[in-house]
């Protein structure tokens, strides 16, 4: 309106509106971006100065930021380093100030480093093995159920993720969401049930699972553990480690069965 306030008119009630307004997909553009698609005013503490997809992005302080309690450095540079060893080396040498996606098996080591502070937080994201349900052999529900019962989630959480997380249950809503379901029984590792569904599926031969450390920290080891637990059900999983570089372009959402990661959203809707 004329007073400088943003007015949102809804066609129906939406209790999640305040949270939806905080989603990073929501942007404000002059005339809705119809005049110039890449035009934006921006309300954050930094302005984008350069961007190379899959390489780096640089930012400079926004002198017109409407808040004075943030943006305390003059510039920020985000560098893409898919290789875990390279990220840790960059942090340890002082080349970078922060890294994310630390492998659980290296957390204890980093905690002993005098110049490193390890920060933990619970989140809404999750690690998973995704399959194209419209592509064979994964278009067979019995095969999908066989794989779900053939994965030892607790073993992956304990042995691969170092206990940093909670068990997933084949849907994307965890306890960090306000409306997380509490009445759905946890699906547990059950090689007998897995074998039963696998037999019903009529499938034979190995199943190719593609993975990479780019998917999530420990993704390669998790895939190998999945392979081992599935053997007890008579299911042969072939694990193929893909290069970290190019994984999100060449493998994820391209190949039918892959390791992946999904970030959280403001609400479960």
Language-model region placement:
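Alpha-helical secondary-structure segments
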Residues: 3-9, 44-45, 72-75, 92-93, ...
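Structural transition elements
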Residues: 166-200, 216-219
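Surface-exposed binding/hinge segments that line
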Residues: 1-29
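Periplasmic binding protein-like
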Residues: 228-269
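Gly/Pro-rich hinge or "lid" segments in bacterial periplasmic/extracellular proteins
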Residues: 20-71, 75-77, 83, 196
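Short, hydrophobic alpha-helical packing/hinge segments within bilobed ligand-binding/sensory domains
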Residues: 87-88, 96, 106-107, 143, ...
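Ligand-site clamp/hinge motif
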Residues: 64-109, 228, 236
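Ligand-binding "clamshell"
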Residues: 108-120, 253-257, 268-269
């Amino acid at each position: 309106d004329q007073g400088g306030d943003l007015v949102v008119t809804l066609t129906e009630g939406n209790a999640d509106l305040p949270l939806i307004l905080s989603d990073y997909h929501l942007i404000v553009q002059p005339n809705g971006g119809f005049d110039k698609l890449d035009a934006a005013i921006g309300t954050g503490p930094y302005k984008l100065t350069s961007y190379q997809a899959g390489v780096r992005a640089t930012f400079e302080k926004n002198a017109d930021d409407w808040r004075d309690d943030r943006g305390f450095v003059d510039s920020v540079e985000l560098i893409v380093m898919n290789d875990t060893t390279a990220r840790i080396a960059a942090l340890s040498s002082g080349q970078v100030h922060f890294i994310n996606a630390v492998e659980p098996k290296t957390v204890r080591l980093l905690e002993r480093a005098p110049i490193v502070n390890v920060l933990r937080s619970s989140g809404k994201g999750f690690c998973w093995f995704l399959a194209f349900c419209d592509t064979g052999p994964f278009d067979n529900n019995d095969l999908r159920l066989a794989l779900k019962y053939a994965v030892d989630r607790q073993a992956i959480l304990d042995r691969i993720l170092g206990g940093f997380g909670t068990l997933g249950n084949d849907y994307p809503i965890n306890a960090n969401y306000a409306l997380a379901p509490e009445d759905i029984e946890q699906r547990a590792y059950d090689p007998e049930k897995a074998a039963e569904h696998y037999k019903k599926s009529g499938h034979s031969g190995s199943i190719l699972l593609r993975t990479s450390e780019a998917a999530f920290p420990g993704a390669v080891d998790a895939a190998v553990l999945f392979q081992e637990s599935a053997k007890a059900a008579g299911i042969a999983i072939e694990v193929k480690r893909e290069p970290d570089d190019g994984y999100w372009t060449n493998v994820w959402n391209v190949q039918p069965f892959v390791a992946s990661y999904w970030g959280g959203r403001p609400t479960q809707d």
